[in-house]
Structure formats: structure tokens, C-alpha cells
């Protein structure tokens, strides 16, 4: 009888140990552990949660996470003193571009870019834009501008024209003047309405310049582009100068 009682006690102890809270996993729980270098900081296990927010900044010390997107001509860009220098040559229709390897959705996109003096009348554009396809594209494009647009905006000799465009759904293009030879923060802010569609705002140095409600939303993701392209819509002559831009940083903050 003693042997049976002893075996029963052992069995009950084993059963209690196997069911202790430390060995049970709740799929809805967040598992944490201490950082060995900072014991007071708790880390959250990403295996149990889904984090939809993303934050990225590229300072252009290199082109990691970017790839060539040049359409015409040679890839005319390199890293120079912590900036991406990108250009297009005169008397060509070169279209020099880089894009992110990854795609992104709702959030705030910011380019820090130096806009130099550009050739008078040149059909050349500095681009900071988001692209999915030809109708799902959101742009900043900066150039000398056609004379008709310059006249309409009463542009001074040291003014350039920035085109802020949604290429479709709906199409909208707004033009404003900016001064050449300056650094700018160009921001595209994509927020979501209650039905999951995007509202996009174009900002220059944090001042809102244009806004539009799009008919598409969060299922459409974009790659981020930096470019200098010779394009016919933005001037009155094939470029006579080598036009360039400097990109100091690109940033994305997801929501």
C-alpha cells in the first residue's frame, strides 16, 4: 500500500509540474524578455504580434535598399559627400532614376533635395515621386517650366516651377513657384479615410500646397523614386545644360 501511495504522489507532482504557468502558451499573449545589456528594458516578441507601422530613413551614405530605374541613357548618379547626386546631360532625352527595392503604403514620405539653378527653357525635371503604375503615381516635378505657365504664375527670373500631380483616379496637377538654389523638404502625406482610400497632401517645407481625395487606397503600394529626367512637358527646348539635383535624405514614416 505504501508503494502505491508513493507512486501516486510522484504522479501528481509530475502532473502539476507539466501544467505550470511557465510552460503554457497563450497565443494572444505578448512574450517579453529582458535585454542582456539593458536589464530594465523589455523586448516584445514579434512572433506573436503584427506591427503595421514602419519607419525608414535613407541618408545616402550608400545606395543600400535602392536600385537603378533609369529608362533612357546611362545611370547618371553617384554618392557624393553623403548626398545622392543625379543628373541628365544636355541634348539628350536621358531619364536618370533610382527607386526603393521595397514598396510602401499609407504614411509620410519626405525628400530633402537641393534644387539648383536650371537651364532657362530646358525640358528637364527634378523628380521626387511615388510610383505603382502610370495611373497610380504621385509626383513632385521641378523645372524651369513652359513659358505659358511661367507667365500665368508671374514667375521671376530666379523662380522655378514645381508641378504636384496625381496621374490618375483622379488626375490633378497643381503648379507653384519656388526659388532656385535652395534646399527643400518635399513631403507627400498619404492618410486613410474610413473606407480605406487615400487622401494625399503635397507639402513644401511643411506648408500644404495641394490636396486630393483618391479613389484607390491601402491595397495600392508604391516604390519611392528620385530622378532627374529630360521631359518635354516641363520646358520649351531640348536641354542645353546638364541639369542635376542633390538628395540628402529620403524618409518614410508609416501609419
Question: What spans do the regions from the language model cover?
Answer:
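Extracellular glycan-recognition surfaces and repeat-rich motifs
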Residues: 62-84
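Ligand-recognition surfaces built from glycine- and aromatic
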Residues: 108-110, 216-255
Amino acid at each position: 500500500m505504501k508503494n502505491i501511495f508513493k507512486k501516486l504522489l510522484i504522479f501528481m507532482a509530475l502532473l502539476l509540474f507539466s501544467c505550470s504557468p511557465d510552460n503554457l502558451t497563450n497565443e494572444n499573449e505578448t512574450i517579453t524578455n529582458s535585454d542582456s545589456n539593458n536589464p530594465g528594458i523589455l523586448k516584445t516578441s514579434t512572433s506573436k504580434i503584427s506591427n503595421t507601422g514602419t519607419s525608414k530613413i535613407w541618408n545616402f551614405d550608400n545606395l543600400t535598399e535602392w536600385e537603378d530605374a533609369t529608362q533612357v541613357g546611362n545611370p547618371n548618379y553617384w554618392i557624393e559627400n553623403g548626398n545622392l547626386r543625379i543628373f541628365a546631360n544636355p541634348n539628350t532625352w536621358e531619364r536618370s532614376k533610382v527607386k526603393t527595392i521595397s514598396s510602401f503604403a499609407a504614411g509620410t514620405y519626405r525628400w530633402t533635395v537641393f534644387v539648383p539653378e536650371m537651364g532657362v527653357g530646358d525640358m528637364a525635371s527634378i523628380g521626387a515621386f511615388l510610383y505603382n503604375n502610370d495611373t497610380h503615381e504621385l509626383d513632385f516635378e521641378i523645372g524651369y517650366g513652359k513659358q505659358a505657365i511661367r507667365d500665368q504664375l508671374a514667375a521671376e527670373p530666379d523662380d522655378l516651377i514645381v508641378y504636384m500631380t496625381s496621374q490618375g483616379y483622379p488626375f490633378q496637377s497643381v503648379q507653384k513657384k519656388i526659388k532656385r538654389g535652395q534646399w527643400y523638404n518635399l513631403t507627400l502625406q498619404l492618410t486613410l479615410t474610413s473606407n480605406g482610400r487615400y487622401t494625399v497632401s503635397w507639402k513644401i517645407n511643411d506648408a500644404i500646397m495641394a490636396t486630393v481625395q483618391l479613389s484607390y487606397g491601402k491595397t495600392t503600394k508604391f516604390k519611392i523614386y528620385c530622378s532627374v529626367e529630360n521631359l518635354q512637358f516641363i520646358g520649351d527646348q531640348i536641354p542645353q545644360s546638364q541639369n542635376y539635383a542633390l538628395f540628402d535624405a529620403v524618409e518614410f514614416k508609416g501609419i
